[in-house]
Structure formats: structure tokens, C-alpha cells
Amino acid sequence: KLGYTKESRQDLLCQIMDEAKVPRPVQAAVLEVVESVSFTTGTPCRPELQTESAIVCDADRLDAMGAIGIARTFAYGGAKGRPIFSPSTKENSLQHFEDKLLRLKDGMKTGEGRRLAQTRHAVLVQFVEEFKKEWNEENIELC
């Protein structure tokens, strides 16, 4: 997501599909599914694409969970200049866990997505608990 607009992502995706000789109707369906995935701005797909949309959505959300999701959260926060944690502002990477990551498990759309999300969600919960415990022990401001 960093460094790309919605339009530039779509252009890049179309270029890749053109090079792979993906037929235009399939390209349109892929773009529609991609647009349906966003956590905050997703738009519903046509009924005939809802299975594909559910699978891609779960895969995207699973990427944001677990150990890799934790790493991605702090990498993104660092790229945006956010502190790891600061009790004086909600503009910090740890807040993203409360705002979004810890809610992902309940939004899974497929049985397999729900199954995989259980373990990754537990990793997130354990990390946040341990982070807060250490923060309270150290009581330092991290940057």
C-alpha cells in the first residue's frame, strides 16, 4: 500500500494481467474482488464473485495477523513516523492492534479463514499483553 494510489495499484494489476494475457472480463472480475477486500472501504461484489471475494479477503486479513502481521504493523508505523507506543497519543503502532488487528478474527468469511485466524489472533493477544506488561515494568517512552 505504501507509495501507491488506488489508481496506480489498479494500473499495475492490469498491466500484469495484460502481460499474462488474462481476458478482459476476468480482469474486471479480479479488480472487483480486489476492491471488495479493504477493511474500511470495501465494496460488495456481485453475488457470483462473493466466494472469490471471501477467500481473498480472508487471505488479506490473515496476512495482517500473527507474527508476520506484528512485524508489518511496526514496519508500516515506522515508515509513517509513528512511535511504537506512546500513552499520550493514539497515533502509535500499538493502537493499531486495538483499532483493527484484534477485530479481524471475528470478520473472517470462510471456515478455513476462521480456523487459521484462531492461532494468529492468539499470537496478537499474547504480544499485546506481554508488551503492556513490559511497558508497565519499564515505564519508558519508545520511539
How would you name each of these model-derived features?
Residues 1-2, 30-40:
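His-Asp-centered metal-binding catalytic motifs of divalent-metal-dependent phosphohydrolases/nucleases
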Residues 2-4, 42-143:
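Divalent metal-dependent phosphate-bond-processing catalytic cores, especially two-metal-ion Mg2+/Mn2+ enzymes
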Residues 6-19:
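An active-site-proximal "capping" alpha-helix that borders the catalytic cofactor pocket
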Residues 13-16, 34, 124, 131:
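Hydrophobic alpha-helical packing residues
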Residues 20-24, 111:
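Inter-helical turn/loop segments and adjacent helix faces that build the functional surface
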Residues 25-33, 49-55:
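Alpha-helical scaffolds flanking conserved acidic
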